[in-house]
Amino acid sequence: MTRPTHGGNLAWAAALAGCSPSLILDFSASINPLGPPKSAIAAIESQLQNLNAYPDPDYYQLRASLCQLHPTLTPDWILPGNGSAELLTWACRELSELEKTYLVTPAFSDYKRALKAFEATIGEYPLELQVRGYLPTFQPSSLKIDTETRRHGDAETERFSSSVVNANSWMPNVHLSPLGLLLNNPHNPTGQLFDQEVILPLLEQFALVVVDEAFMDFLPPDQQQSLIPRVQDYPNLVIVRSLTKFYSLPGLRLGYCVAHPDRLRRWQQWRDPWPVNILAAAAATAVVKDTDFQQQTWRWLASARSQLFQGLASLPGLHPFPSAANFLLVQSEQPSSQLQKKLLEHSQILIRDCLSFPELGDRYFRVAVRTETDNQRLLDGLNLIL
């Protein structure tokens, strides 16, 4: 089997471990281990009798339900999709129409794949690896375009400045050619969280800014740095959200986009009808109202992430990064592909190598935060092979 570029490939892992896929403990996909919520299962069961009917092509009830998460919005500002991946495809189609689109790297591999599918010109802005005390961290630099290089007209040597993030460190240059920016927040795979004040000024500099907030739900509301409350102020802002990670529904494929209604109407003309099946729509409508599950998740994550971080930091040759999300990036003194293979063979545990991130390579791996019992099993498995 070909080595997967995504997490969650249990068939590949089981073949390597020599066991059934059901026996694999999966730390490679960053999915909430507390779900799916009972509300989702009940909603799906209630719709089984309606499988002989097409979904509402406008998904009005689903959009209205999503507005409960974002009360400042009306349904025409929201577009459900077949996972956030489908919606990112249409975002990349728009970005490809610009002169160049920048990715904050290391970046989720699907961003570059989707941009290349539409023959986009891609630039990269790397996060800088720094060590503070004994903790490694990625320090974002100011997302400011080097305008001096542009005056020389050399697109190949155009770069971003490397000053430390400062939202007031630049002024927009209206003479710049149309540029796009695609990033995620919290950042995957580092788990770093960008403040709103870092991203908002970029909306004056870039023609289109797409922010993938797939993991933002894992932060309690008072800690989130979502730009959804500001989307009505910026017609060039697109926010993409996932419902499958927080609610543990990756098999249903469900996400949504928040953007100007004119943009969303254009996207609807590009895509196939009925991208969200009737069971997924019912589950989504139910889970966004499930405040008990949301509170349970926020209570679980803080303690479980701390347990896993401290446990990894205590193991020889491993250096975890602080994270705001439900996963941890770990720097390893041993090749991560070897650790991955040994963990599967000895403990039937799957971790996510970072070979699909060229900036990271074989000295990093990523692990999801799971229950404290599962986390301890991972720590014991790593201790056995290190």
Which residues fall in each region the model found?
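PLP-dependent enzyme catalytic core of the Aspartate aminotransferase-like
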Residues: E345-H346, S356-L386
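N-terminal small-domain helix-loop-helix segment of the aminotransferase-like
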Residues: M1-A85, W90
